[in-house]
């Protein structure tokens, strides 16, 4: 859906399967992070986020979205799209703060810009790491479900063959 929106798009892909898919669909890939989904870690998330933050801060990217597979439950995985940059207040659930809660002004030292320059990269890294972990859990769950289904089918076939064998004796 995002790729169909008007404008110029840059595609950053994590993993070989995603790269194959987008290349086969005729999409040009800006950068392919050749990491396996099997071992998501914070250092990989940091490398990805630094690349995206650098291009966003240089004005090469207007918006940054992450599309990944989120595990809804043990049977269902959903495609999830999250807007990472620019940050929006609505993403932080300010509406969920109770109205009767006392609010005070927050003073940030040495400046708001300095604090945000430290917080935003960590937030983006954390979100990307969370997406990598969620995608890994989703893939692992899909494999486990497929293996259970294959095992159940094999057991049913063995049972049927055993009955047929015993009848033939």
Regions from the PLM with identified roles:
Residues 1-169:
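C-terminal beta-strand-loop-alpha-helix "lid" module of Rossmann-like NAD(P)-dependent dehydrogenases
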